[in-house]
């Protein structure tokens, strides 16, 4: 073996060692640890406070997403009744969209800017950051709402903080709304459900079309949207039955009228 080949072999070994160290330092030792998600948060109330991490995103006094939407499909989280108090729940809170619309009290005690007083937030979006068993990525407005009066901006500068949360019954103060999504057509129904008091989240949607005596289950599409694909035209008026996570069933007779149109909201009476 020549001197040149020996030197080249040494260079190759050094490169391999450098790559291995870079992987260990950059991939395994840097950044926050990956924490597995906690157990799913179900429709139980009056429970003790649970620990979580809180972060925030979007504009400091905004609603979170720039388009006022999010992973639940809502398009108005900056308006009442959400009032920019939206939260991205991690896996056991968002639950692949089945947690959309559920309500939580949140509070923080540290840092000093925290008021310790609970405020209500709504699950409107998702996050998959593995920084804690439970993680709320809050709209800037919602994060600041945990602060003492006048200390909102200082609290937001803290970035990641410890917080406590518990599930509460929703009191939207608005009528249940059924929004037919833009892509709907006579053979395809995509229904966004929002403002459901009580549990807030929906686990089943069944519809009864004009002339039918039986309910047909819709398929969960994504977020708070449920759908039906049909070989025949879907005829109104349509009665909708909602089932919440706690098992409450509510029927909305003929809430979607004959001649229904895409990109239109229909409100329960």
Swiss-Prot record:
Record key words, sorted: Allergen, Cell wall, Cell wall biogenesis/degradation, Disulfide bond, Glycoprotein, Membrane, Secreted, Signal
Pfam family, one: Expansin_C
Boundaries of every Expansin-like EG45 domain copy: 69-175
Glycosylation sites: 40
Compartments, record wording: Secreted, Cell wall; Membrane
GO biological process, one term: plant-type cell wall loosening
InterPro entries: Expan_Lol_pI, Expansin/allergen_DPBB_dom, Expansin_CBD, Expansin_CBD_sf, LolPI, RlpA-like_DPBB, RlpA-like_sf
Biological role: May aid fertilization by loosening the cell wall of the stigma and style, thereby facilitating penetration of the pollen tube. Acts selectively on grass cell walls, which are relatively poor in pectins and xyloglucans and rich in glucuronoarabinoxylans and (1-3),(1-4)-beta-D-glucans, when compared with cell walls of other angiosperms, including other monocots.
PANTHER family tied to this protein: EXPANSIN-B1, EXPANSIN-B3
Annotated protein name in UniProt: Expansin-B11
Origin organism lineage: Eukaryota, Viridiplantae, Streptophyta, Embryophyta, Tracheophyta
Gene giving rise to this polypeptide: EXPB11
């Amino acid at each position: 073996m020549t001197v040149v080949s020996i030197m080249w072999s040494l260079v190759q070994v050094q490169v391999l060692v450098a790559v291995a160290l870079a992987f260990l330092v950059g991939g395994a030792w840097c950044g926050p640890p990956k924490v597995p998600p906690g157990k799913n948060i179900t429709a139980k109330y009056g429970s003790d406070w649970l620990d979580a991490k809180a972060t925030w995103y979007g504009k400091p006094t905004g609603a979170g997403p720039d388009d006022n939407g999010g992973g639940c499909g809502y398009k108005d989280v900056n308006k009442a009744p959400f009032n920019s108090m939206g939260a991205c729940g991690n896996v056991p809170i968002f639950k692949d969209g089945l947690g959309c619309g559920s309500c939580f009290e949140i509070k923080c005690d540290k840092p000093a800017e925290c008021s310790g007083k609970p405020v209500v937030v709504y699950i409107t979006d998702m996050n998959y950051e593995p920084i804690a068993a439970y993680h709320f990525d809050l709209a800037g407005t919602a994060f600041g709402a945990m602060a003492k009066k006048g200390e909102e901006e200082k609290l937001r500068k803290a970035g990641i903080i410890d917080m406590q949360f518990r599930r509460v019954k929703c009191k939207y103060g608005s009528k249940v709304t059924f929004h037919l999504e833009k892509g709907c057509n006579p053979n395809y129904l995509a229904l966004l459900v929002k403002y459901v008091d009580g549990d807030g989240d929906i686990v089943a949607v069944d519809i009864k079309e004009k002339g039918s005596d039986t309910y047909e289950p819709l398929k969960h599409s994504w977020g708070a949207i449920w759908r039906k694909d049909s070989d025949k035209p879907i005829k109104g008026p349509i009665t909708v039955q909602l089932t919440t996570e706690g098992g409450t069933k509510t029927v909305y007779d003929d809430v979607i009228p004959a001649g229904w149109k895409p990109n239109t909201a229909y409100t329960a009476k």
